[in-house]
Amino acid sequence: TAVKELLLEKQETFLVPAENVANVMCLNPLSHAALVLSQVRYSKIPVLDKGDRFVGLIGLTDVVDKMFDLTSVDFEKLNEFTVADVMEVNVPVIGESWDLEEVLHLLVDASFLPVVDDNQRFKGIITRKEILKAVNHMAHELEKHHLVLPKSEEEMKVI
């Protein structure tokens, strides 16, 4: 369809490559994760294992929750735990040959989607921001290149 073609025109810009995405290793101490998360603009970042395989996500709230008990804040607690102790593990991921409809559906509830190869190796992320840029491009270009006409009552019944 014309809409899908226009959306996918900028497809090469959708993937932020792994080397440009902040991440932490699952065995890193939480103190390291806190440092990395405080330096990046993402609320969550990917967690990888030694083989660069995607294993989960971690956010600043996951780290901060471990620092608090009922009466105080203990920064030393961050050295007692690893990223693996608090990371989110049931995270939707997509393969390198992803489907646009699936990506759009998943990005409703996530600001980005991890992209992995067949061996779960982390390849990068597709962000909601990049998809919205493509939607904006499509909205501006659709009527420049295509005649958009309303369907008749009869044509609408066919759907």
Put a short name on every predicted segment.
Residues 1-159:
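Tandem CBS (Cystathionine beta-synthase) repeat/Bateman regulatory domains
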